[in-house]
Swiss-Prot record:
This is Serine--tRNA ligase. It comes from the Bacteria. It comes from Leptospira interrogans serogroup Icterohaemorrhagiae serovar Lai (strain 56601). It catalyses: tRNA(Ser) + L-serine + ATP = L-seryl-tRNA(Ser) + AMP + diphosphate + H(+); tRNA(Sec) + L-serine + ATP = L-seryl-tRNA(Sec) + AMP + diphosphate + H(+). HAMAP family: Ser_tRNA_synth_type1 (MF_00176). CDD domains: SerRS_core. Pathway: Aminoacyl-tRNA biosynthesis; selenocysteinyl-tRNA(Sec) biosynthesis; L-seryl-tRNA(Sec) from L-serine and tRNA(Sec): step 1/1. GO terms for biological process: selenocysteine biosynthetic process; seryl-tRNA aminoacylation. NCBIfam families: serS (TIGR00414). Homodimer. The tRNA molecule binds across the dimer. L-serine binds at residues 232-234, 286, 385. Pfam families: Seryl_tRNA_N, tRNA-synt_2b. The gene is serS.
Length: 417
């Protein structure tokens, strides 16, 4: 959802952004400008008529006091009132049309975002850690997990169908250890406040963060109760401050939560059908920040370093890439992905996305702060995975495997076992 002034004053720039994103309905911007213009004209006409009605109403009062006949002027007031209702109805129609189009528009791109059409055009920023070498052919995480009897995919499928799994014994303990380790680092070292949030949210929450209305088919919904299973803790964490005005001296606010996440993975048929990479339910530790606009770039960098710090402590090799215009999410202005090395799969795999949304979500969710001069302004929101537990789990299995089938546990996790 974009600023209407920006749309009207930067039409050609906006069209270029949409083209870079691969947005096909470029002509909708001209339609949007026409709606904005009609809305202004209706608003102006309604204001003039209200002023006319107010003057006439005062005149009615004066005539009444003097004992005169108000029949004619009362009829005139009534007629003006009917015209106002008619214009207000048209105004409401234009406002609804405006909102529907604006809710479907993607965010403005940061100038640093490289042009491109797909993930193949993303640019590697840097690599961290040494890729391990093995004196044997490394196994995949699902082979290791099944051999250790830590992961049982068959029982997961029996319970929930495809893309499901169960953890057992030390395998279950490893997942719990990762959760506690990540939360401890983020709360004790990175100064985030831990929050426990619901796994079901209302439509307003999904709308504010940008999942609805455009991507409604990608998520699980409980129609009877009008609730949605969260695809990420970004949704409930960001909506903690929906429709609120935050005092300036409370910013920046940094919150974190561990939750289950639920995704239909409707567009991923045939991709990563085995293992923990692409599943319908997974655990994740999420990071969200609310800050002043002038601080968002620096806070974005900080969050990226916080997510990286988890991988550094776990001694997992990774790289950071910047997403191109054709691969970045519609809601984000700029996104850095962290990809961890997977020896068994013999490729890098996304383990975290860290995004700056600028005021895109704040405008949808009416999340504002009151500045020292008393003005209400939109905050900027930033979010990132810190990290996805299942993929971190998979990376540990593949990077810390031994030739005899045993597994080494990262030093930082040993105290959690």
């Amino acid at each position: 959802m974009l600023d209407l002034r920006y749309i009207t004053e930067n039409t050609e720039d906006l069209k270029k952004v949409l083209e870079l994103r691969g947005f096909k309905e470029i002509g909708i911007i001209d339609e949007l400008k026409s709606i904005i213009q009609r809305k202004r004209e209706f608003q102006k006409e309604a204001d003039i008529l209200r002023e006319e009605r107010n003057k006439a109403s005062k005149e009615v009062g004066k005539i009444k006091q003097s004992g005169g006949d108000i029949t004619k002027i009362s009829a005139s007031v009534k007629l003006v009132g009917e015209k106002i209702k008619e214009i207000e109805s048209k105004l409401e129609q234009e406002e609804n049309a405006l909102l529907n189009i604006n809710l479907g528009l993607p965010n403005i791109l940061d100038p640093k975002v490289p042009p491109g059409k797909s993930e193949h055009d993303n640019i590697v920023q840097y690599e961290v850690g040494k890729i391990p070498t093995f004196q044997f052919v490394p196994k995949t995480h699902f082979e290791i997990g099944e051999a250790l009897h830590w992961i049982d995919f068959e029982k997961g499928v029996k319970l929930s169908g495809a893309r499901a799994y169960t953890y057992w014994k030390d395998g279950a303990r490893l997942e719990r250890a990762l959760m506690n380790f990540m939360l401890d680092v983020h709360t004790k070292e990175h100064d985030y406040t831990e929050v426990w949030v619901p796994s079901m949210v209302n439509d307003e929450s999904m709308m504010a963060t940008g999942q609805y209305p455009k991507f409604k088919d990608e998520f699980y919904r409980i129609d009877k109760d009008e609730l949605n299973l969260i695809p990420t803790a970004e949704v409930p964490l960001t909506n903690l401050y929906r429709d609120e005005i935050i005092p300036e001296d409370q910013l920046p606010i940094s919150v974190t939560a561990h939750t289950s996440c639920f995704r239909r993975e409707a567009g991923s048929y045939g991709k990563d059908t085995r293992g923990l990479v692409r599943v319908h339910q997974f655990q994740k530790v999420e990071l969200v920040k609310f800050c002043k606009p002038e601080d968002s770039e620096e806070e974005h960098k900080k969050m990226l370093s916080h997510a990286e710090n988890i991988l550094k402590k776990l001694e997992l090799p990774y790289r950071v890439i910047i997403l191109c215009s054709g691969d970045i999410s519609a809601n984000s202005s700029i996104t850095y992905d962290i990809e961890v090395w997977m020896p068994g799969l013999n490729r890098y795999m996304e383990i975290s996305s860290v995004s700056n949304f600028r005021d895109f979500q704040a405008r949808r969710g009416k999340i504002r702060y009151k500045s020292k001069d008393g003005k209400n302004q939109l905050v900027h929101t930033i979010n990132g995975s810190g990290l996805a537990l299942g993929r971190t789990y998979a990376a540990i299995l593949e990077n810390f495997q031994n030739e005899d089938g045993t597994l080494r546990i990262p030093e930082v996790l040993k105290s959690y076992f």
